[in-house]
C-alpha cells in the first residue's frame, strides 16, 4: 500500500524494491453489474465504508522481492508533494514547555473541580433543608385547608338535610292539594251529571226544585274549593322551585367542597416517594383562582342564609294549607248532606251493540296475539340469517388478503358471492314481510282502539239509561280524601274502596273503575258505568267535562 502526500521519514515511504520477477499480465476487465435495487437508509445511517480516511489513497498489489533484489535500492527521484522541509518541526525546548503547560493545566483543572464539588455539596445540603421546610409548611397549610373545608361541608350538609326534609314536606303538601283538588272532580262531575240528567226529564218533572238548587250550590262550592287549592298548590310549586334552587346551590357547593377536599387530601398525602407525582412545567405561572378565603367563606354562608329563608317561607305555606283543608272539608260535607236529602233516580239500559262489539274485540285481540307471534318469529328468522351472512362476508374479506396471483376468482369465490347475495335477498324478503306484518298489527291495534272507544260510548249510553243520579250519590269522598291524604288511582272509578259505590247494575261488563255494569265487556277504565267508572274526557259524551286526566272525572251522565 502506498499513500500519497506523506513525509520522507515515514517507514512506508522507503525506496521501492526492484524485483526481478516479470510483471503479471493485466487481468481482464471485470464485468459491470448494475444493481436493480437501491437500498433505502434512514437519516443517521452509517455506510460500511464510513471508517475509511478522507485523504486519497491507492491500493496496490506487490510481490515480495527476494533477498538479492535489496542491493539495487535507490532513493526516489521525486519527493512527496506535501513535504515542505527535510528537518523536524519542533525543538526539545518546545517539547518541554508543552509538557509543563499540560501538567499545570491539569493541576488547575483538578483544583477547580475539587472546589466546585465542595460548593455543590454545601448548596445541595442547604437547598434540601430549605425545600424540606417549605414542604412541611405547605403540608400544614393543606391540612388546615382540609379542616376548614370539612367544617363548612358539615354545615352545608346539615342545612341540606333540613332543607330536604322541608322540601319533602312541601312535596307531600303539594300532592295532598293536587289529590284533594283531583278528588273533588269526582263529586263535581257527579253533581254536573245529576244536573244534566235532570235536564232530560220530561213534562212536569222539569221543576226547579230544592234538589236542583242544592246541586247548583254544590257545584259552585266544589269549583271554589278547587280554585283555592290549585292557587295554593301553584304557590307551593313556586316555593318548591325556590327550595330546589337553594338545594342545587347547596349540593353544588357540597360537591365542590367534596372535590376540593379530596384533591387537598390527595395533595396532603403526596410524598417524595409517591408514585403519582410528575413534572407539570409552567403550573407555577398559571393562576386560576377565583376567590380568596374571605369570599370563599362568605359564599357558603350566603347559601346557608338563603336556605334558612326558604325554609321559613315553606313553613308559613304549610300552616296556611292545613287551615284551608280543615275549613273546606267541613263545608263540602255539609252541602253534600243537604243535597242528598232530595234526590231520586230512574234507570234504563241498552246492551245489544255492546255485546257484539265485545265479541269482535275478542277476535281482534286474538288476531293481535297471532300477529305479535308472527313478528317475533320473523325477527328470530332475520337474526338467524345474520350469522351466515357474517360468515360469508368474513370469508370474502379474508380471501381479499391473498397475495398476488393467489387472488383467484375460483369456484369458492363465486359460491361465496352467490351465498352473500342469496342471504341478503332472503333478509330483505323477511324484513319486507316483517314490515307488512307490523303494519297489519298497527291496523289491528287501531281497530282495537276504535272498538274500545265504541265500547266506552256504548257503556256510557248504558249508564245514561241504567244508572241515574241516586246511584252516583250513594257516597261522598271521606275527610282524608278531601284533605289529600289518600288519592284515587289513575283509571280507577270515583270513591274507590267505598263499599256503597261499588255496585252491580245488572250486567257482566267489568269496568276499570272497579264496578260491573250492564253489559258483557271489559272497558279498561275508559267506559262510564253506573256512575262509578271514570271517563277519559268529553269524547264519551255530548257534554264537555273538565277532567284533567283519566280516572279523575265522570262522563256527563254517568
From Swiss-Prot:
It is found in: Cytoplasm, Cytoskeleton, Flagellum axoneme. Its main location: cytoplasm. InterPro entries: Tektin-like (IPR048256), Tektins (IPR000435). Specifically expressed in testis. Keywords: Cell projection, Cilium, Coiled coil, Cytoplasm, Cytoskeleton, Flagellum, Ubl conjugation. It comes from the Eukaryota. Residues 347-381 form a coiled coil. Ubiquitinated, leading to its degradation. Deubiquitinated by USP16, promoting its stability. GO terms for cellular component: axonemal A tubule inner sheath; microtubule cytoskeleton; sperm flagellum. One of its GO terms (biological process) is cilium assembly. Pfam families: Tektin. Sperm-specific microtubule inner protein (MIP) part of the dynein-decorated doublet microtubules (DMTs) in flagellar axoneme. Forms an extensive interaction network in different conformations that reinforces the helix bundle composed by other tektin proteins (TEKT1 to TEKT4) and MIPs to anchor the tektin bundle onto the tubulin wall of A-tubule of the sperm flagellum. Microtubule inner protein component of sperm flagellar doublet microtubules. Interacts with TEKT3. Belongs to the tektin family. This is Tektin-5. The gene is Tekt5.
Amino acid at each position: 500500500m502506498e499513500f500519497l502526500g506523506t513525509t520522507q521519514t515515514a517507514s512506508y515511504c522507503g525506496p521501492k524494491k526492484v524485483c526481478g520477477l516479470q510483471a503479471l499480465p493485466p487481468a481482464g476487465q471485470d464485468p459491470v453489474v448494475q444493481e436493480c435495487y437501491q437500498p433505502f437508509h434512514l437519516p443517521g445511517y452509517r455506510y460500511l465504508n464510513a471508517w475509511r480516511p478522507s485523504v486519497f489513497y491507492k491500493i496496490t498489489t506487490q510481490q515480495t522481492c527476494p533477498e538479492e533484489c535489496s542491493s539495487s535500492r535507490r532513493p526516489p527521484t521525486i519527493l512527496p508533494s506535501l513535504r515542505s522541509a527535510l528537518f523536524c518541526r519542533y525543538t526539545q525546548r518546545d517539547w518541554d514547555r508543552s509538557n509543563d503547560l499540560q501538567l499545570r493545566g491539569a493541576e488547575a483543572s483538578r483544583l477547580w473541580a475539587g472546589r466546585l464539588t465542595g460548593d455543590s455539596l454545601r448548596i445541595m445540603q442547604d437547598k434540601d433543608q430549605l425545600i424540606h421546610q417549605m414542604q412541611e409548611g405547605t403540608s400544614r397549610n393543606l391540612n388546615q385547608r382540609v379542616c376548614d373545608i370539612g367544617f363548612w361541608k358539615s354545615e352545608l350538609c346539615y342545612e341540606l338535610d333540613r332543607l330536604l326534609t322541608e322540601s319533602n314536606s312541601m312535596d307531600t303538601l303539594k300532592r295532598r292539594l293536587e289529590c284533594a283538588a283531583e278528588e273533588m272532580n269526582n263529586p263535581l262531575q257527579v253533581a254536573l251529571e245529576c244536573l244534566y240528567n235532570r235536564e232530560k226529564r220530561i213534562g212536569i218533572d222539569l221543576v226547579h226544585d230544592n234538589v236542583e238548587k242544592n246541586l247548583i250550590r254544590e257545584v259552585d262550592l266544589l269549583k271554589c274549593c278547587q280554585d283555592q287549592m290549585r292557587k295554593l298548590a301553584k304557590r307551593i310549586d313556586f316555593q318548591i322551585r325556590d327550595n330546589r334552587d337553594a338545594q342545587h346551590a347547596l349540593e353544588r357547593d357540597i360537591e365542590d367542597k367534596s372535590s376540593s377536599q379530596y384533591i387537598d387530601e390527595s395533595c396532603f398525602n403526596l410524598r417524595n416517594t409517591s408514585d403519582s407525582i410528575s413534572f407539570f412545567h409552567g403550573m407555577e405561572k398559571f393562576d386560576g383562582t377565583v376567590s380568596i378565603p374571605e369570599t370563599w367563606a362568605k359564599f357558603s354562608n350566603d347559601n346557608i342564609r338563603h336556605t334558612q329563608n326558604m325554609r321559613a317561607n315553606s313553613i308559613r305555606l304549610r300552616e296556611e294549607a292545613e287551615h284551608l283543608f280543615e275549613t273546606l272539608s267541613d263545608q263540602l260535607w255539609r252541602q253534600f248532606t243537604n243535597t242528598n236529602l232530595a234526590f231520586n233516580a230512574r234507570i234504563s239500559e241498552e246492551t245489544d251493540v255492546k255485546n257484539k262489539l265485545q265479541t269482535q274485540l275478542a277476535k281482534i285481540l286474538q288476531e293481535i296475539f297471532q300477529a305479535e307471534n308472527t313478528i317475533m318469529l320473523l325477527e328470530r328468522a332475520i337474526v338467524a340469517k345474520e350469522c351466515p351472512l357474517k360468515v360469508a362476508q368474513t370469508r370474502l374479506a379474508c380471501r381479499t388478503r391473498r397475495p398476488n396471483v393467489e387472488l383467484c376468482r375460483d369456484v369458492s369465490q363465486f359460491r361465496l358471492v352467490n351465498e352473500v347475495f342469496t342471504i341478503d335477498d332472503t333478509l330483505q324478503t323477511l324484513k319486507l314481510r316483517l314490515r307488512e306484518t307490523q303494519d297489519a298489527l298497527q291496523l289491528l291495534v287501531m281497530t282495537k282502539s276504535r272498538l274500545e272507544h265504541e265500547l266506552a260510548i256504548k257503556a256510557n249510553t248504558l249508564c245514561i239509561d241504567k244508572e241515574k243520579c241516586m246511584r252516583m250519590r250513594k257516597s261522598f269522598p271521606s275527610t282524608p280524601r278531601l284533605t289529600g291524604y289518600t288519592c284515587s288511582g289513575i283509571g280507577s272509578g270515583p270513591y274507590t274502596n267505598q263499599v256503597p259505590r261499588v255496585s252491580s247494575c245488572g250486567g257482566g261488563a267489568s269496568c276499570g273503575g272497579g264496578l260491573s255494569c250492564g253489559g258483557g265487556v271489559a272497558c279498561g277504565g275508559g267506559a262510564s258505568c253506573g256512575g262509578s267508572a271514570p271517563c277519559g274526557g268529553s269524547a264519551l259524551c255530548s257534554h264537555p267535562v273538565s277532567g284533567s286526566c283519566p280516572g279523575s272525572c265522570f262522563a256527563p251522565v254517568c
